[in-house]
Amino acid sequence: MPKDIQKYFKSYLKDKDSLKIIKSNTKEYNLIMGLLNTYGVLSYDKFYEMFNNIISCDKEYLFDRLTILNNFYGEFELYFSKKEKYVCNKAILKEKGIQLKDIKKYVNKKSNYKTFSSKELTSMFSYKYMSKFKSFKKMLSFVKKNYYLDEKDIRVFYKYVIIPYLNDVQIDNPTKEDNLSKNIDKYFEYKNEKHKNKFMDLVKGIINEAPMWKYNGYSEIEKEKGIVWNK
């Protein structure tokens, strides 16, 4: 990067107003992705209702933000027809035979969503929500014992290893274990086959406690306890 541009960015990051904008944008992004990783597909009205309960805004503002973030990150989809509008976790579209026009079949008609606090929803995409569970703590303890990780590394690990695996499980991707092995190997080096299997087992172990969009935000454990959800 040219030195004059580096100098500009350094000064930008020191500016208080700029830092406020960055903080606000990050919170919006984390909430958007937190909602979609928790609930999968939402009608635009429902998505706006949930978003507005935490970050107050009008519908036009939210639509603009969604459009900008979708164009930049490409992590979700917006579906609009003459009668219907949906916001969709892009991972769902990886399920065999599913196209964007079919996405309404995933919408929860009964609206029996699990409710979370604003803090939980804004931390859902950054691993903080999962960090309270024993299975996640056990997995993270193993990783920290074998590798050096700082806060940024943990966020990257969660976003690019844990979340893709959770999504693969929910769409029953036949290559989910192979994908998990490859994704781990991108960021960590396996010591041996035993170490690899232990690492993968610990990641797979968090599935039972993780919120699932296919269960409207409830976990596998909650489902087995008889929590009602809309398939």
Mark where each language-model region is:
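Acidic/negatively charged segments and metal-coordination signatures
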Residues: 1-231
